[in-house]
Amino acid sequence: MTAGTVLLLAGALGTDAFSLCLGLGLNGFRRRMAWMLVGLIVALHVVLPVAGWYAGEFTGRLVGRWAAYLGAAILFYLGVKMVRESLAEGRTATGKLERAGFLGLTVLAGSVSMDALSVGFTLGTAGAALLLTAGVIGLVAGLMSAAAFVLAHRVEDWVGRRAELLGGLVLIGVGLRLLF
């Protein structure tokens, strides 16, 4: 997998976190809680691809090239899912979630990081460089999340939806690239 592909993939994975953080930031999420959430997003965007990578590497040895097809199908599915969700009406984030504390933030971070587990599986089947790729995914997701909080007071609500739509289209493209 090329560096450009890894960056595109990392950006696509970071769009869910960006959208969440933008929505929370627009609703007055406190700075301390915002930085805790960003840290959790970074951690999960590094750990989950590593876990998925090991599962994908094992599967790649077990079933060979078919594992790459499965990985491409997973990326394609995730991309379509993200596009559909970005077009759905009535999705909102709320700053009231702060009351849930650290556990609530962990659940929020996990909700936007689970796609990274599936992507890690795909990386394992493709034989991608594990630590570098997971680090890039975590760094990009963290930067996108932090940027969303910083920019939240300057942007309109429509940006979050379009970011998720773009991320879904990128995942579809990466999935198709793995097939061909």
From Swiss-Prot:
Transmembrane segments: 6-26, 33-53, 63-83, 101-121, 130-150
Chief place where the protein resides: membrane
Cell compartment(s), UniProt: Cell membrane
Membrane topology summary: Multi-pass membrane protein
Domain of life: Bacteria
Record keywords, A-Z: Cell membrane, Ion transport, Manganese, Membrane, Transmembrane, Transmembrane helix, Transport
GO CC aspect terms: plasma membrane
GO molecular function, one term: manganese ion transmembrane transporter activity
Protein family per UniProt: Belongs to the MntP (TC 9.B.29) family.
Role: Probably functions as a manganese efflux pump.
Protein name: Putative manganese efflux pump MntP
Lineage of origin: Bacteria, Bacillati, Bacillota, Clostridia, Thermoanaerobacterales
